[in-house]
């Protein structure tokens, strides 16, 4: 089972401007062959189908699979932020000469507007649907680890290319975070393969790059984010049995296996978009949802008070 935390793994700063083109490029990092949906599903299935007694490797897979769920959420929310404000508000006296969604005709992906109500979709940058055929699980531990390393390396390569396509702050923040986390995951799988007899020497990481020209990436590396992996569980994990000691790459890093989950960041709250008929709630329906929200707030407050009383 999995538990849900209503936060994102990294903060998304406000977008500089509506940017449907950057949103479309980032779709590759979500639903592409080497995107976050692929890594999430591949590691989940390798975890669920794991055979044998080498459970530390299964714990490793489970921790990264769980992290990738948060990456899917992060990229989806970033795409939404990049699309926010791209269309015009719905005029109060709408008539034929006013077309609040005309921007969709010039957008690189009309489905962002026509199908998804100005939101992300499970597709790549060319609009191709995400495919289950991307998922690799041979049942062989060494083969799976090798393939996962290749997946992380290719994903990082593509994100380094994405970094150079847009300087939009929201876009850059998420892409930079994923560049650093993909490097950490390269190290996780490389270290796992080291314990299985592989000597990497100087072959990795992929790509080899000087991040001094990427200030957002450099800032995250300065807090050792590229050498850390969380267990994403409150229970005992064998992750630290594998992910420890020196980095498997020739970079002088020291690896950290950390219990629990990373500190999160707020999830952006998208406003209603009447021109998209989203959320589509009229006055009466809004009153009903506000009542539900008030009930939820009261319940949470009551629960917190009860817990505090018990502690006394």
Name every feature range the model reports, one short phrase each:
Residues 1-312:
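Non-heme di-metal
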């Amino acid at each position: 089972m999995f538990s849900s935390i209503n936060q994102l793994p990294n903060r998304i700063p406000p977008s500089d401007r509506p940017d449907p083109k950057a949103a479309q490029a980032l779709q590759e990092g979500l639903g592409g062959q080497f995107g976050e949906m692929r890594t999430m599903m591949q590691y989940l299935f390798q975890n669920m189908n794991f055979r044998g007694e080498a459970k530390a490797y299964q714990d490793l897979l489970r921790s990264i699979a769980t992290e990738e769920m948060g990456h899917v959420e992060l990229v989806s929310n970033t795409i939404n932020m990049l699309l926010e404000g791209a269309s015009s508000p719905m005029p109060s006296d709408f008539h034929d000469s006013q077309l609040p969604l005309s921007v969709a005709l010039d957008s690189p992906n009309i489905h962002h507007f026509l199908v998804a109500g100005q939101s992300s979709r499970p597709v790549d940058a060319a609009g191709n649907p995400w495919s289950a055929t991307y998922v690799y699980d041979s049942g062989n531990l060494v083969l799976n680890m090798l393939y996962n390393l290749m997946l992380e390396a290719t994903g990082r390569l593509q994100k380094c290319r994405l970094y150079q396509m847009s300087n939009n702050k929201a876009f850059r923040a998420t892409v930079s975070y994923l560049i650093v986390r993909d490097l950490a995951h390269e190290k996780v799988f490389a270290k796992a393969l080291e314990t299985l007899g592989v000597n990497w020497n100087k072959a990795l990481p992929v790509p080899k790059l000087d991040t001094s020209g990427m200030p957002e990436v450099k800032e995250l590396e300065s807090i050792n984010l590229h050498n850390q992996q969380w267990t994403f569980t409150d229970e005992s994990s064998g992750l630290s049995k594998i992910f420890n000691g020196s980095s498997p790459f020739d970079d002088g890093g020291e690896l950290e296996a950390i219990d629990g989950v990373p500190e999160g960041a707020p999830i952006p709250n998208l406003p209603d978009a009447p021109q998209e008929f989203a959320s589509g709630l009229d006055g009466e329906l809004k009153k009903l949802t506000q009542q539900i929200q008030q009930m939820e707030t009261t319940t949470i407050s009551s629960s917190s008070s009860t817990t505090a009383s018990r502690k006394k």
